[in-house]
């Protein structure tokens, strides 16, 4: 019997609260940092309940059907191997969105929600009746779709090089009438938009090649091309700096997500390329998370 089966050996827990405790313990034994949260999300996924509804049901002493408990056992065993929760449920929350995700696409992170807010603010402040926003390397489409849905007067364009990731982005953005998605290279995409964009934003690959992320969910499951940005992690950012200058109108804003230790190097890079008003911004954990600059 594998560790993944331990919580369900013998008689299944009869109550939802007992099953929640057993699942959380199984995930804690597997080394997960938030086992209770993951257990609640897995059980909620099986039962079709939100976390609040699930917690209320556990307090009431609700019981769970055997078939649902067995389905949960299989999903919890997968999570105990460090398969991403989002791959198991097939979805990832992002701001007001629920995105479809799975193998072949980078899972959107909560910290990116703050980064896209800067782009949304710039679009909302634009004097243009239909400002143009461009997402370079859109992955799942999270950033592009957030801009398109929260600033409906904007015209949003997104490019993704990976066919696998592009397929996920196409699924997520299919109903966004003000969003254009293309499969292609961010270095050459959208030539027809030169000099028109109010905002160019990217969450590019920025992990240095020698710094393999420690979390199995990241280094085993996130696409390699979405993680690594060359020896210093800045190879793709260098390309974006040059391309964004061509796409933005004078005074247009570039928004770049990056690792917490890269702000100074990126500001120096952007300054050398002729950008102005470069600034690095912290996320909610007080770590440097994004750098902005204005086109000359």
Please state what every model-predicted region is.
Residues 36, 43-121:
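Conserved AdoMet
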Residues 1-55, 59-62:
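Non-catalytic accessory regions of SAM-dependent methyltransferases
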Residues 1-25, 124-132, 174-178, 192-194, ...:
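Short, low-complexity, intrinsically disordered N-terminal peptides in bacterial proteins
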Residues 140, 150-296:
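S-adenosylmethionine
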Residues 119-128, 246:
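Glycine-rich helix-loop-beta junction characteristic of Rossmann-like nucleotide cofactor-binding loops
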Residues 129-137, 157:
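Conserved class I S-adenosyl-L-methionine
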